[in-house]
Curated annotation (Swiss-Prot):
Its main location: nucleus. WD repeats lie at residues 36-75, 78-117, 120-159, 162-202, 204-242, 246-285, 287-324. The keyword Lyase does not apply. SUPFAM superfamilies: WD40 repeat-like. It comes from Danio rerio (Zebrafish). Part of the small subunit (SSU) processome, composed of more than 70 proteins and the RNA chaperone small nucleolar RNA (snoRNA) U3. May be a component of the proposed t-UTP subcomplex of the ribosomal small subunit (SSU) processome. It is found in: Nucleus, Nucleolus. One of its GO terms (biological process) is positive regulation of transcription by RNA polymerase I. This is U3 small nucleolar RNA-associated protein 15 homolog. Keywords: Nucleus, Repeat, rRNA processing, WD repeat.
Amino acid sequence: MASFKPTKVLSYPKLGEKVTEETLYWKNYKPPVQIKEFGAVSKIDFSPLPPHNYAVTASTRVHIYGLHSQEPIRNFTRFHDTAYGGSFRGDGKLLVAGSEEGLIRLFDIGGRVSLRQFKGHSKAVHATSFLSDGFRVLSGSDDLTCRVWDVASAVELSSITEHTDYIRAIAPSKLNPDVFVTGSYDHTVKMFDVRSGNSVMTMQHGQPVECVLLYPSEALLVSTGGRYVKVWDLLKGGQQLVSLKNHHKTVTCACLSSSNKLLTASLDRHVKVYNSSYKVVHNFDCASSILSLAVAPDDEAVAVGMTNGVLSIRHRKHKEEKEALTGRRKRGPSYRFFVKGKNFVPRQDDFLVSKPVRQHLQKYDKQLKRFEVSKALDTALETWTRTTKPEVTVAVIMELNRRGTLKNALAGRDEVSLTKILNFLLKHITDPRFSRPLLTVGDIVLDLYQQVIPQSPVVERLLQRLYEILGREAELQQELLQVLGILDTLFASLMPRKEVASFGAAAAAQESQLQAA
């Protein structure tokens, strides 16, 4: 009796992802270094001047870390409650931070005691920053106000009350020291001019705004809130340029790289890098939800702060380190490996015993061996198989069709199993690799269940979608055939024409050859 032949599953080449220079650039980072903080890391800010230390705001402290250090080189612990929004001044010598108690503190990087305290907010101050002149501080608070303070005298210069909900994001202009942008939980993004005290532009984000960001040219503005990242064209009066929805949860922060590429981070634990056309070119995965994100100048490091109090820093690999890693060689085999069996000499009376190779069959092959065709199809349509290895499901269908039992396997299905088959058809019937056997399945399903389709609205809806997909595919095939006909005509017109001698001329030439002979 011949042995059972397992189902032959065709192997298809895997299409790798398109690797671009930007993808390689952002993959060129070491594994992250993780530092445990005292609470959720709400803000990270790099100093604009070398050695590019960065401030980390977490719990009731603001720590200053060196670019390659894992221990803080400076601690600011004068906060009685949670600290927020620690930010450097343009020269990297001063730092400002808000707090849950409503106070804003100004620190000298070289000292520990606060130089100034700005009092005036009645609720928590989540966003603080220096205006570009360096002599004024901007703050946004949960008391619905945005205020400007004088650094020298600690006096409030102006207060703006146009927002109707918490102000959680601010972005001062670097080109004009009197202009800044705010984002609020009232779903609006506003641009203000300190000289007038009123907003000069308003954009509707549509979700509570968590972060606002100005491009260096200040022609574009980025706002994040909810699952959306929106880019606004300020030169066109705040017109929306693009709306991105690549995250699954709230986008909490955004920043720009040295080449002005946009990076966004979300509660879904992903950092996404966009190119100039706002397509995702790389992802960084983190262990917990992300609250803060910052990129060092020249992209030397990417720092991420998370809700579980972990600060994660990825440093860029340098050429010397790459050469050191690639230059290592694996240890070669030992001497005993080479001399093993060297002195063995087979004898003439040796008897060679071949060990039989046991054949291991898959579950669907065992069922096919027992002629359980319906169970074999059910096994091939299991969730993991049909989603990760559709070629296995199609191979079982082709084997059933070869045996002539495909119709029997598809018959007698309930609504749940029929829904699985139809969903598989919807997903893969337009795939050129699987279209021929799946079209056969579709014909058999229509023949078997045509009378009972109206009884199930789910099956009827899936069949309607299948009908629409096949209609679009037929239209596409028709258009491709038309294009093929046009190309054939063009190629035929471009081909050089060959002159064909007439019958009379050929006969005269033959007669002249005979006379000459």
